[in-house]
C-alpha cells in the first residue's frame, strides 16, 4: 500500500511537472508575442511622431500664410479707407470710376471672406489633428506601460516556475530513491501475500462447502415452514396472516386519535359558523323582529337550521373509525371498513353545502342591493361570495379523494395501488386549500364586520353576531391549518402502509379475504395464547420496582443532587425557624408558670388560721379550682400563631396585660439578638462573595491567558514540527547527495589509483628501458 501511495504521488508530481512545463511554454510564447507587439507599437509610435512633425510643419506654413493674408487684408483696408474720401470728392465727376471701385471692393471682400473661411477650416483641422495625436500618444504610452509590467510579471512567473521545477525535480529524485527501497520491501510482502492467498483460498473453499450445506438445509426448512405461497392463484396468498407489527398499530391509533381531536375541534366551529350565519340572516339587512325577511332568506335560514344533522355525523364517523383501530387488528386500506362511513357522512355534508350555496350567494346579492350597503361593503360581499364558492369546491375535492381512499375496503378493483400516492398527495393539497380559503374568509369577513359596525343603524345584536361568526371562522382557520400540517407530516407514513399484501402487487386485496385474514389472525393469537405457559416469578414485582428505584436514585445526575441539597437546606431553615419558635414558647411558658405559682402562693397566704376545720376540704378543693381556672384561662387565652421568614410568633389575648411588658422585652431582646446574628452572617457572606468574585475574576483572567499561551504554544509546536520535518527531509536529501558524491569520489579515486598504478608501471618500464640503453652505450 505504501508503494502504491508513493507511486501515485510520483505520478501526480509528474503530471504537475508536465502541466507546469506546458504552462511555461505558453508563458514564454505569450512573452514573445507581447515583445513583438511592443516592438510593433514602438514602430507605430515612431510613425505617429513623424506624422506629428509633418502636421507641425504644415501648421507653421499655415500660420505664415495666415500672417501674409492678415497683412494683405490690412493693406486692402487701408486702400479702401483712402479710396472712400476720394470717392466722395469725385462723386459727381466719376460715376464710372466709382462703379469700378465698388466692383473691386466686392471682389476683395469675397476674396477676404474665402481666405478667412479657409483659415478657420485649417485651424479646426489642426486642432483636431493635435487632439487626435495626443489621444493616440496617451493610449500608446499606457499600453506600453501595461505591456512592460506584464512582461516583468511573466518573467517573474517564469523565474518562479523554474525554481519550482528544480525543487520538484530534486524532490522527485529523492522520492524515486525511496520508492526503489520500498518496492523491494513490497516485493517481499507480495511473496508473503501470495502464500496467504493460497491459504485463504483453501479456507474459502471449505466455507463455501459449509455454507452450501447450510443453504440447502435452510431452503428445506423454508419450503416446509413458510406460509402458503401459491404461484398460480394469488388470491389464496391474501389469506396469509401478516406479521404483527405492534408499533405500526400503536402509531396508527395515535394518528387516528389526533385526527379525531382535530375533527372534534372542527365540528363545533362549523356548527357555530352555520348557526350564527342563520342568526345574522334574521337580523341584517332586515330585522325579523321588526319586519318580515325575504322568502329567499327564509328558505336559506330553514336550510341552515338543519346543519347539525349534517355536521355532527362527521365526528361520529371519525369516532367509529378511531374505535375500529386497535392493537390486535391490521390497519391498512383494505381493513378500514369504517372509513366508508366517514366518507358517506362527508358526502352528505358536501351535498348540504351545494344545497345552501345558491341561497348564500343570492342572500349576499340581496345585501348588496340594500340601501344600507356601501361600495366598500359591496366589494367585501363579492369577495365573500367567491370565497364561499371556493370553500364548496374544496370540500367537493376533499370528498372525492376520501371516497377514493374508502374504495379498497369495498371495491378493491376500482383503482390501482400505485395511484394512491397521488391521491394522498391531493388530499394534503385539498386540506391546504381549505386552510387558505378559511384564511381568506376570516380576512374578508373581518373587513366586512368593521364596515358594518360603522353603519349608524347597526344594532348591538348585529355586532355580537358578527363577532361570533368571525371567531368561528378564526377557529376553523386554525383547525384547518393544524389538520393540513398534521396530514403533511404523516403522508409518507400513509403511503408506506397502504396494503398488507405483497409490495410488488399492483392492486388491493379483496375485503372478503381481508376479513378472513383478520379472523385467522384472531384464531392464531388465541392458539398462541393457549400454548403459552405462565412463567414462574423470579423476583416479586414490588421488590423489582423498589430495586429499580434504588438503582435510579443511586445514579442520579448532578442536577438532581443539587435539587436535593436545595430541598435539604430549605428543610433545615424551616426546622431552625420552628426551633426558635418553640424556644420562645418555652420561655413564655416558664414566665407563665412563675406567675401562676406566685398567684397560688398569695392565695394560700390569705387564708386565716380560724378556718382550721375546713383546711382539709380547702386543700382538697384548691387543686381542683386551680385546674379549673387553668383550663378556663387556657380556653380564654387560646394562642394565635403567625409565621414569618425569621420565625413563628404566638399572640395571646389582652387577658395577660400584666405580663405584656416583660413578654415584649423578652421578644425584643430575642429578635435583636437574632437580627445581630443574621447581620453578622450577612456581612460574612457578603465578604466571602466579594472574595470569591475576585478569585473567580482572577481565575477567569488566568484561564484566558492560559488559553492564549496554549494557542501560541500549539502554533509554535506546529511550526517546530514543520521545521523538524523540513529539516529531516533536507538532512535526508543532503545525506543522500553526500553519499552519491562520496560514491562518485570513491569511484573517481579508484580510477585515479588505477591510472597512477599504470603510470608507475610505465615509468618503471621506461626506467628499465633507459637503464638497458645506457648499459648498451657504455658497453659500446
Curated annotation (Swiss-Prot):
Its main location: other. Expressed at 16 dpc in the cortex (at protein level). Residues 1-209, 556-605, 694-742 form a coiled coil. GO terms for molecular function: RNA binding. It is found in: Early endosome. Transmembrane segments: none annotated. GO terms for cellular component: early endosome. Keywords: Coiled coil, Endosome, Phosphoprotein, RNA-binding. This is Protein phosphatase 1 regulatory subunit 21. It comes from Mus musculus. The lineage of its organism: Eukaryota, Metazoa, Chordata, Craniata, Vertebrata.
Amino acid at each position: 500500500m505504501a508503494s502504491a501511495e508513493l507511486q501515485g504521488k510520483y505520478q501526480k508530481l509528474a503530471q504537475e511537472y508536465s502541466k507546469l512545463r506546458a504552462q511555461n511554454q505558453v508563458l514564454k510564447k505569450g512573452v514573445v508575442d507581447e515583445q513583438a507587439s511592443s516592438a510593433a507599437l514602438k514602430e507605430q509610435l515612431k510613425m505617429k511622431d513623424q506624422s506629428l512633425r509633418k502636421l507641425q510643419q504644415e501648421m507653421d506654413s499655415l500660420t505664415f500664410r495666415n500672417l501674409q493674408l492678415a497683412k494683405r487684408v490690412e493693406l486692402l483696408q487701408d486702400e479702401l479707407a483712402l479710396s472712400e474720401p476720394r470717392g466722395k470728392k469725385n462723386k459727381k465727376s466719376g460715376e464710372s470710376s466709382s462703379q469700378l471701385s465698388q466692383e473691386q471692393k466686392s471682389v476683395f471682400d469675397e476674396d477676404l471672406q474665402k481666405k478667412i473661411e479657409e483659415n478657420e477650416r485649417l485651424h479646426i483641422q489642426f486642432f483636431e489633428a493635435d487632439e487626435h495625436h495626443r489621444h493616440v500618444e496617451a493610449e500608446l504610452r499606457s499600453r506600453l506601460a501595461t505591456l512592460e509590467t506584464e512582461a516583468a510579471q511573466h518573467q517573474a512567473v517564469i523565474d518562479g516556475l523554474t525554481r519550482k521545477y528544480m525543487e520538484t525535480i530534486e524532490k522527485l529524485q529523492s522520492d524515486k530513491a525511496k520508492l526503489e527501497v520500498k518496492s523491494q520491501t513490497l516485493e517481499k510482502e507480495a511473496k508473503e501475500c501470495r502464500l496467504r492467498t493460497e491459504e485463504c483460498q483453501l479456507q474459502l473453499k471449505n466455507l463455501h462447502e459449509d455454507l452450501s450445506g447450510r443453504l440447502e438445509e435452510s431452503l428445506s426448512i423454508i419450503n416446509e415452514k413458510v406460509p402458503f405461497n401459491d404461484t398460480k392463484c394469488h388470491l389464496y396468498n391474501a389469506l396469509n396472516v401478516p406479521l404483527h407489527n405492534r408499533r405500526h398499530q400503536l402509531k396508527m391509533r395515535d394518528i387516528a386519535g389526533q385526527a379525531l381531536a382535530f375533527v372534534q375541534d372542527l365540528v363545533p366551529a362549523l356548527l357555530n359558523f352555520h348557526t350564527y350565519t342563520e342568526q345574522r340572516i334574521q337580523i341584517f339587512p332586515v330585522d325579523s323582529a321588526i319586519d318580515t325577511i325575504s322568502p329567499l332568506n327564509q328558505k336559506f335560514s330553514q336550510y341552515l337550521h338543519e346543519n347539525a344533522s349534517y355536521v355532527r355525523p362527521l365526528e361520529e364517523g371519525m369516532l367509529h373509525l378511531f374505535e375500529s383501530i386497535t392493537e390486535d387488528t391490521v390497519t391498512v386500506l383494505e381493513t378500514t371498513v369504517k372509513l366508508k362511513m366517514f366518507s358517506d357522512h362527508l358526502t352528505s355534508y358536501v351535498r348540504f353545502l351545494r344545497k345552501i350555496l345558491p341561497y348564500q350567494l343570492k342572500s349576499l346579492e340581496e345585501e348588496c342591493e340594500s340601501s344600507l350597503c356601501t361600495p366598500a361593503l359591496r366589494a367585501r360581499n363579492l369577495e365573500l361570495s367567491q370565497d364561499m364558492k371556493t370553500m364548496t369546491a374544496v370540500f367537493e375535492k376533499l370528498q372525492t379523494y376520501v371516497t377514493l381512499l374508502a374504495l379498497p375496503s369495498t371495491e378493491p378493483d376500482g383503482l390501482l395501488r400505485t395511484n394512491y400516492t397521488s391521491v394522498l398527495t391531493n388530499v394534503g393539497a385539498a386540506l391546504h386549500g381549505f386552510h387558505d380559503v378559511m384564511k381568506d374568509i376570516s380576512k374578508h369577513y373581518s373587513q366586512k364586520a368593521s364596515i358594518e359596525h360603522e353603519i349608524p343603524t347597526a344594532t348591538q345584536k348585529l355586532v355580537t353576531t358578527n363577532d361570533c361568526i368571525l371567531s368561528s371562522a378564526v377557529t376553523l382557520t386554525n383547525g384547518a391549518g393544524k389538520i393540513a400540517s398534521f396530514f403533511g407530516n404523516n403522508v409518507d407514513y400513509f403511503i408506506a402502509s397502504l396494503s398488507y399484501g405483497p409490495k410488488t402487487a399492483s392492486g388491493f386485496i379483496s375485503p372478503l379475504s381481508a376479513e378472513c385474514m383478520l379472523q385467522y389472525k384472531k384464531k392464531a393469537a388465541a392458539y398462541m395464547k393457549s400454548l403459552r405457559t405462565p412463567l414462574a416469578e423470579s423476583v416479586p414485582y414490588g421488590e423489582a420496582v423498589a430495586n429499580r428505584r434504588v438503582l435510579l436514585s443511586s445514579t442520579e445526575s448532578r442536577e438532581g443532587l443539587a435539587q436535593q441539597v436545595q430541598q435539604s437546606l430549605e428543610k433545615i431553615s424551616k426546622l431552625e425557624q420552628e426551633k426558635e419558635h418553640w424556644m420562645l414558647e418555652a420561655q413564655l411558658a416558664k414566665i407563665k408558670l412563675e406567675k401562676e405559682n406566685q398567684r397560688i402562693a398569695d392565695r394560700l397566704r390569705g387564708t386565716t388560721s380560724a378556718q382550721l376545720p375546713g383546711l382539709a376540704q380547702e386543700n382538697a378543693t384548691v387543686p381542683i379550682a386551680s385546674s379549673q381556672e387553668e383550663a378556663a384561662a387556657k380556653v380564654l387565652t387560646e394562642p394565635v400563631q403567625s409565621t414569618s421568614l425569621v420565625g413563628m410568633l404566638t399572640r395571646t389575648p389582652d387577658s395577660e396585660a400584666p405580663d405584656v411588658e416583660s413578654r415584649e422585652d423578652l421578644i425584643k431582646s430575642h429578635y435583636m439578638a437574632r437580627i445581630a446574628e443574621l447581620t453578622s452572617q450577612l456581612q460574612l457572606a457578603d465578604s466571602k462573595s466579594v472574595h470569591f468574585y475576585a478569585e473567580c475574576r482572577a481565575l477567569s483572567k488566568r484561564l484566558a491567558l492560559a488559553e492564549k499561551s496554549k494557542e501560541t504554544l500549539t502554533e509554535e509546536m506546529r511550526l517546530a514540527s514543520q521545521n523538524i520535518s523540513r529539516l529531516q527531509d533536507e538532512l535526508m536529501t543532503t545525506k543522500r547527495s553526500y553519499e552519491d558524491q562520496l560514491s562518485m569520489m570513491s569511484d573517481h579515486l579508484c580510477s585515479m589509483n588505477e591510472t597512477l598504478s599504470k603510470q608507475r608501471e610505465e615509468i618503471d618500464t621506461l626506467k628499465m628501458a633507459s637503464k638497458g640503453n645506457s648499459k648498451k652505450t657504455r658497453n659500446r
